[in-house]
A protein has these predicted regions:
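Cytosolic-side transmembrane-helix boundaries in multi-pass membrane proteins
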Residues: 36, 243-276
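Small-residue-rich segments of transmembrane alpha-helices in multi-pass membrane proteins
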Residues: 39-48, 94-106, 127, 171-181, ...
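Hydrophobic alpha-helical segments within and immediately flanking transmembrane helices
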Residues: 18-22, 36-52, 72, 99, ...
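Membrane-interfacial amphipathic/re-entrant helices at transmembrane-helix boundaries
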Residues: 1-17, 88
Length: 276
């Protein structure tokens, strides 16, 4: 078992922390589906590379995928929900649907289109390599360091946007930086685990943390612990029950969310505000 599961388990232990942190911001901003839309845009870039018969593991494929993701980052940053009558979730939903449809069209030119669509959705974390893990980890560390130094701006824009506007913060610029770094993380992770698992890692642990704690740091810690437990448990279930690993992990996270919701009824008082 260890020969097959070693690197997938390492990936589930090393990579989710930053995703949980970004998910906390996404949930607080009320743009729940931005992650799946960004992941789909990254996949659209990969589909374009497939249509052009490029090597999926080549740097060029990654940069093409990142380019599509940055286009989405610019779109979402400059159509922010703070102004205008059209909710940003509508723009995000439209972007997701169009990207998904375009991906299907591009893959129709590939002889292995159906298999590519399946991999795009649920990925195959069992095939992850040591090189992919540590390359992705290095990127995550870089993004994490940037967010640490810019944490005051990002926290203000997520938790006190009116205050940010009042003191003259360049909202669109900082939103773009958030979405761009977010897209960089999503682009690298979606190639390993697929669109659905990216969405799961970003949203479910963050929601579990919010359900059970008041302070941002405690919520983040709870989310990280649950993401580690959910990923490893899902891998074990998939191995012993001979199930698709990505789908098994998603279902385990669903069970964890239900259990967390039940527990939260008894342990958390309704807060008036979030202590960052």
């Amino acid at each position: 078992m260890w020969d097959v599961m070693m690197w997938p388990i390492v990936a589930c232990l090393l990579l989710p922390g930053l995703l949980v942190y970004l998910g906390m911001h996404v949930v607080r901003r009320g743009i729940i589906f931005v992650d799946i839309a960004m992941a789909q845009m990254a996949s659209l870039g990969v589909c374009f590379a497939v249509m052009k018969h490029m090597d999926l593991d080549s740097p060029l494929t990654f940069w093409i995928s990142l380019g599509f993701t940055l286009l989405a980052a610019a779109l979402f940053a400059f159509t922010g929900k703070r102004t205008g009558e059209v909710p940003q979730e509508a723009i995000i939903g439209i972007a997701y649907v169009v990207a998904a449809a375009a991906s299907v069209i591009l893959l129709s030119y590939s002889t292995e289109g159906d298999e590519q669509i399946k991999n795009m959705l649920i990925g195959n974390i069992l095939l992850v390599t040591k090189q992919e893990i540590f390359r992705t980890l290095a990127l995550f560390v870089g993004v994490g360091v940037f967010h640490w130094f810019a944490r005051k701006r990002f926290m203000m824009l997520s938790f006190a946007p009116e205050e940010a506007v009042a003191i003259g913060v360049s909202v669109k610029l900082w939103d773009f930086l958030f979405y761009a770094t977010f897209g960089l993380v999503v682009t690298s992770f979606v190639q390993i685990v697929g669109v659905l698992l990216v969405f799961t890692y970003l949203i479910v642990p963050a929601v579990c943390g919010i359900l059970t704690a008041r302070r941002f740091g405690v919520r983040l810690a709870i989310g990280v612990v649950l993401s580690l437990a959910g990923g490893v448990t899902g891998l074990m279930v998939s191995f012993y029950q001979d199930l698709p690993s990505g789908a098994a992990i998603v279902c385990v996270f669903g069970v964890l969310l239900v259990l967390t919701g039940i527990v939260s009824i008894f342990i958390k008082e309704k807060p008036r505000r979030v202590d960052a």
